[in-house]
């Protein structure tokens, strides 16, 4: 299995993975702009040119505290590849990358419905932070 960061030519395969994992459509132009920058990266695992697992990483540096955080979104594994340890492998790779880049924290949000994913996060040492998520549609 090949580990890589998402490139423009990988976008169609990534869109299929996100559709499979979350039943949502990717905004291709926004995704393309995001991966061209330096703040957002998508770590992907490929088998035969198909992305079978991935995580979107947004790096944030708090200018007041000087702390670097890797914030994870769309941790996903293609349904036919689930149960093979890829979710754990994704998290291990992110933690290793965060350590290598001197990050202070790795953070993510997860739906209560995603029981398998939440188990992985707890098993990998993540804790629930005492925070409420506020949201306002504009």
List each model region and its residues:
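Acetyl-CoA-dependent GNAT
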Residues: 5-67, 73
């Amino acid at each position: 299995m090949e580990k890589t960061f998402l490139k423009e030519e990988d976008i169609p395969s990534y869109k299929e993975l996100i559709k499979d994992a979350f039943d949502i459509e990717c905004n291709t132009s926004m995704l393309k702009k995001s991966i061209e920058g330096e703040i957002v990266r998508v770590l992907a695992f490929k088998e035969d040119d198909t992305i079978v697992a991935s995580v979107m990483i947004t790096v944030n540096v708090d200018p007041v505290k000087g702390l670097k955080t890797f914030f994870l979104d769309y941790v996903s594994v293609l349904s036919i590849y689930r149960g093979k340890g890829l979710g754990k492998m994704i998290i291990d790779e992110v933690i290793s990358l965060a350590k290598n880049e001197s990050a202070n924290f790795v953070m993510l949000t997860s739906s209560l419905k995603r029981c398998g994913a939440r188990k992985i996060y707890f098993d990998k040492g993540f804790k629930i932070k005492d925070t409420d998520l506020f949201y306002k549609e504009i």
